[in-house]
Structure formats: C-alpha cells, structure tokens
Amino acid sequence: MNVPGTSTPAGDIPELKAVAGVLGDHVYDINISSTKSMTGHLLGAAGAVEALACIFALTHGVVPPTINCENLDPEIDSKLNLTLNTAQKRDVKCALSNTFGFGGHNSTVIFRKL
C-alpha cells in the first residue's frame, strides 16, 4: 500500500488508523510505504507517480521504501509492516495507492496481477 506519508498530524495517523479499521488484522500482512518520501510533493503529478510505483512493485516484486524515516510517532501501531528505509523483495499480487490532494481531493486506485 502506497500512502501519502506527508508527516503531518492531520494525515499520517488518521490514515493509518482508517486503513487498520477497514482491513482489521489483515493490515499486518501488507507492506505500507510512502514513495512521496523519495520524490517530494509533486502536486498534480503525485498520484500518477505513486500509481507508477505500485505498477513497478507488481512488475518487479519490489516494495519501495519510505526513506529517511528515523523516528515513528508513538501513536503508530508498532505491528504494522512499514517498509522503512530499504526496499523489500516480495511477491506482490496487488497494490493500492491512496492519494489525498490539496483542497480535499481523495482517490484510491488498486492494481493487481492477472
């Protein structure tokens, strides 16, 4: 799962709690990372680049990391499989990208192997 990961109190914690609320215990079986940590905020192009990262993960079996993450907020569930600082090889069967834009625009796209 590619999340925005903007390191804002209004973004990261509520999103991770919402994801955990929807997926229940299955949330611990998935990788969660933010490619925005590598690209910065690309404004209108952010969603497209994050979607391409998901397609790359599906195609190459590599989950991109959230880089430069040293200290996690204590509110973050320590059992989450956050892909921090180092990419992980994994058989990725589906990938989801959450995109939250300025002004309240929200979208989620899901890609899967056929």
Task: Indicate residue ranges for each PLM-predicted region.
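Conserved "HGTGT" condensation-loop signature of ketosynthase/thiolase-family condensing enzymes
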Residues: 1-114
